Amino acid sequence: MKRRRPRSDWRRLLARRDGFSLLEVLIVAVIMVVAMTLAFARWQGYTAQQRLRFGTAQVATDLRQAQERAKSERAPYTVTFLASSSAYTIARAGGGFLENTQLPDQVTATASQVVTFSAFGRPAAAYTVTVQNSWGSGSATVNATGGITYQTP
């Protein structure tokens, strides 16, 4: 008959264990809460950044659209940015077509003056439109020759 070796204390503890201790569950819960908090903070920053990038691209695209409409319809067009607002209007000078455009949530656009394109699509001056939110700011620029560019951080 073989003799059984006595088990050491730690082996006996492991053999009788049916689940996790309260301390182990609490440690895992704390680690998960910290990880979710960090992920949420990064997600908020990411969404703010994407809203800013989308809003800046939208402003540049709408400026190009107003310029192209001015050329195709042989009529001056204006783009008016309301002071620190998330809305702006594209209008045909002297009436006619009017479009109100809304920027993404928490994004505002400001310009020092009304952007005007002649009937040939030429800007009346060089313009810079600043687009901003809690993450930072970007800009859409119309140069004196009619080129339109935008920059985001």
Name the predicted role of every residue range:
Residues 23, 27-34, 70, 79, ...:
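Hydrophobic aliphatic residue packing
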